[in-house]
Amino acid sequence: MEMAAPVSPAPRTVEDIFKDFSGRRAGLVRALTVDVDEFYGFCDPEKENLCLYGHPNGRWEVALPAEEVPPELPEPALGINFARDGMHRRDWLSLVAVHSDSWLLSVAFFFGARLNGNERKRLFSLINDHPTVLEALSDRKHGRDNKSGADNGSKSRHSGKRANDVQTKTSRPAVVDDGYDEEEHSETLCGTCGGRYNANEFWIGCDICERWFHGKCVRITPAKAEHIKHYKCPDCSSSKKSRQ
């Protein structure tokens, strides 16, 4: 894990804020690309809520969130380690990258709160001229994939099939042909709230206990479900931790 950067005065000018942004961005990109195996190892799902920090000197750090409330700076996404083993590695890294981009912008414009309108536009223009963390991660991924056109085509077909499988699993608590009978599954109850199955609502099934849940009850959206390889409901997740 990289060491934290020493505390320095908050940047005030457009140039200084952009320099701070660039250093933090470089650290985050390094964590998700060059140092990805080390970063992955630090994000143990059994640990407490962890965050990925990028520092102005280009270093990165996986650590617990700041204890002071409110924090001195906007905080990055909390608990990135919890989703690590429930998603494909590539999808999880992309999710972390998206949250990292959001955090970088929030920090930059936190520092730029006292800039005037023209200065904020110039700051955003400087930031926007650089690839996002997600784009940097995707470019590196595509560079590896393009080494073999045949392999790339195969992976695309496989990914499409997997996405279709997830969509089918999470759309309703039964997978049947055109003869799907909604009345047959009206007795399916949500494992959290006990509500009856409704075809107009998003549901997701637990791969461990095979119970079904409203997506809203377990805080899973259709978009998030597409990136989950094996879903474990809150009860199954907590029981695993208690045994350990």
Swiss-Prot record:
Site (Histone H3K4me3 binding): residue numbering on this chain: Y197, W203, D207, W212
Functional summary from the UniProt entry: Histone-binding component that specifically recognizes H3 tails trimethylated on 'Lys-4' (H3K4me3), which mark transcription start sites of virtually all active genes.
Domain of life: Eukaryota
Zinc finger (PHD-type): 187-239
Family to which the UniProt record says this protein belongs: Belongs to the Alfin family.
Major subcellular location class: nucleus
GO BP annotations, alphabetical order: chromatin organization; regulation of DNA-templated transcription
Region listing for Disordered, in residue ranges: 137-178
Quaternary assembly: Interacts with H3K4me3 and to a lesser extent with H3K4me2.
Residues in the signal sequence: none
Keywords, in A-Z order: Chromatin regulator, Metal-binding, Nucleus, Transcription, Transcription regulation, Zinc, Zinc-finger
A Gene Ontology term for the protein's cellular component: nucleus
Pfam family, one: PHD
Protein name as annotated: PHD finger protein ALFIN-LIKE 2
GO molecular function, one term: histone binding
Organism: Oryza sativa subsp. indica (Rice)
Subcellular location: Nucleus
Highest classification ranks of the organism: Eukaryota, Viridiplantae, Streptophyta, Embryophyta, Tracheophyta
Compositional bias of kind Basic and acidic residues: 137-148
